[in-house]
UniProtKB/Swiss-Prot annotation:
Keywords: ATP-binding, Cell membrane, Membrane, Nucleotide-binding, Translocase, Transport. Its EC number is 7.6.2.-. Belongs to the ABC transporter superfamily. It comes from Halalkalibacterium halodurans (strain ATCC BAA-125 / DSM 18197 / FERM 7344 / JCM 9153 / C-125) (Bacillus halodurans). GO terms for biological process: thiamine diphosphate biosynthetic process. It comes from the Bacteria. It is a peripheral membrane protein. Pathway: Cofactor biosynthesis; thiamine diphosphate biosynthesis. This is Formylaminopyrimidine import ATP-binding protein ThiZ. It is found in: Cell membrane. Gene3D superfamilies: P-loop containing nucleotide triphosphate hydrolases.
Amino acid sequence: MVKELLTFEEVSFAYSSSSPVIERLSFTVFENEIVAILAKSGSGKSTLFRLITRLESPDQGTIVCHAQGKIGYMPQQDLLLPWLTILENVSLPLEIQGKDKKEAKIIAASFFNRFGLVGTESLYPDALSGGMRQRAAFLRATLTSETLLLLDEPFASLDSLTKTSMHHWLVSMWEKEKRTLLLVTHDIEEALLLSDRLFIFTNQPLHGFTEVQVPPDLRRKMETTEKMEQQRSSLKKDIRALLIEESLR
């Protein structure tokens, strides 16, 4: 039976006396799925993540989250501290959670092979490529949470070749780790490639949305046939038409 991991029920939120950012928003995210969130800049996506991580509390409605431990967060910029080595950066959240520094490093180091980071332990962030830095940031977020990761346009700043490589890598990691991922992206192709479902927000404040189910035979399939490409192209066309239609209203 598929378990509910995160539920928003009629959630509303506004900063002080300003207009609502989120208004009567309801949705459910299930365990071990990847949900992509498509919305225009400034629409309230960051506020949505702040509510999920409990940095903000809703003015109305309820948020139920069954994630074990803390919630992992990976922003567009890797935010690796330049004066710390990669191992020190990755183990830092474990130290903040109360682990002894030596123990934290041992735990973090045990994941470096799985995440393709062996050999970077003693290097500083400036010595790594953009893709490798994002791997380190993803590992850091993974160690923060056992079940739920929030990814805020994590690959937007990467070139197309590195982004494609990271897509392959993320899928392989998800298949091994089986965590629930919420992915904010402006890239329709990325959303269709990686996710089980898309939440397409076209209004402000965030309220209703269009949900798109990605066909099971298209989800996270890196090697595709002509038929699969046609299916993805058709879905992409429909989503783009929806976004254009709503932007003209």
